[in-house]
Amino acid sequence: MATPKFKKSRANTHSRRSQWKADNVALQEVTIDGQTVRIPRRLVKAAKLGLVDVEQF
């Protein structure tokens, strides 16, 4: 595993971390029990099986 040779300053660490941005989750339209809902793709299968309450979305 790579280890740093020199200590990184707190200012450099904070400025690097501040550049990180989270992306919005892409939503997919799904029809469940005659109701069209927009939910994240990873929850589609669980929603169709009834494991997730789609009323939250």
Curated annotation (Swiss-Prot):
The keyword Ribosomal protein applies. GO terms for biological process: translation. Residues 1-19 have a biased composition (Basic residues). Residues 1-20 are annotated as: Disordered. Keywords: Ribonucleoprotein, Ribosomal protein. GO terms for molecular function: structural constituent of ribosome. GO terms for cellular component: large ribosomal subunit. The keyword Ribonucleoprotein applies. Disulfide bonds: none annotated. Belongs to the bacterial ribosomal protein bL32 family. This is Large ribosomal subunit protein bL32. It comes from Corynebacterium aurimucosum (strain ATCC 700975 / DSM 44827 / CIP 107346 / CN-1) (Corynebacterium nigricans). The gene is rpmF.
